[in-house]
């Protein structure tokens, strides 16, 4: 049997500063394969030095073998994946949210599995995404996270499916070009192991 649910989760967090109030037009700042352009996303250039306990809406998937936690408020990343048989995490579980200013728009965190598109470490990697739980006819459950990306007006989704009797998490990426012109993109996931 597979269960999915939403639960409040308190995680020690170093909060981010306020976004720059004026847009930053970065051009020709080649940054790990991207142009560096992030407009219209706001850029954040500061992180607090003090840790606070912050409450997040965490979404969980669980069967007899594994338990997974997804944080839609932090870009829809898989924050935790736990092997219940071996009693250990099978991806790095960073139990403190401490951003570094290395992302295209500033904040980026290590750990879990991060999903990136249309370029680099997704400009919105530290921003909230939409979330939905889908119960499938075969007894599996899928948690979908999605967003309408602002730079190129594409829609990106990641579906996390857990099946009864299986000891793996199935991840499906879906991208939609919502424009009338062809768009280029990169798509990849960064699992921390």
Question: How would you describe each model-predicted region?
Answer:
Residues 1-32, 163-172, 176-193:
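An exposed, glycine/acidic-rich loop-and-rim segment of catalytic or binding clefts
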Residues 25-53, 58-62, 110-168:
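Extended, loop-rich substrate-binding clefts of extracytoplasmic carbohydrate-active enzymes
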Residues 101, 110, 137, 180-181:
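Intrinsically disordered, low-complexity regions enriched in Ser/Pro/Gly/Gln/His and often acidic
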């Amino acid at each position: 049997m597979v269960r999915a649910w939403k639960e409040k989760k308190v995680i020690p967090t170093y909060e981010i500063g306020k976004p720059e109030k004026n847009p930053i037009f970065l051009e020709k700042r080649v940054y790990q394969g991207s142009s560096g352009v992030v407009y219209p996303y706001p850029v954040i250039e500061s992180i607090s030095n003090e840790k606070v306990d912050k409450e997040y809406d965490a979404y969980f998937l669980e069967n007899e073998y594994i338990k997974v936690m997804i944080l839609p408020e932090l870009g829809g990343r898989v924050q935790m994946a736990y092997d219940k048989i071996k009693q250990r995490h099978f991806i790095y579980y960073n139990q403190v949210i401490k951003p570094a200013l290395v992302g295209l728009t500033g904040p980026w965190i290590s750990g879990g599995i991060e999903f990136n598109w249309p370029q680099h470490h997704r400009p919105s990697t530290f921003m909230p995404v939409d979330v939905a739980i889908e119960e499938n006819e075969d007894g599996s459950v899928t948690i979908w996270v999605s967003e309408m990306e602002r730079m190129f007006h594409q829609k990106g989704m990641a579906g996390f499916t857990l099946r009864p009797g299986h000891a793996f998490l199935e991840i499906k990426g879906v991208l939609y070009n919502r424009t009338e012109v062809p768009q280029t993109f990169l798509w990849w996931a960064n699992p921390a192991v």
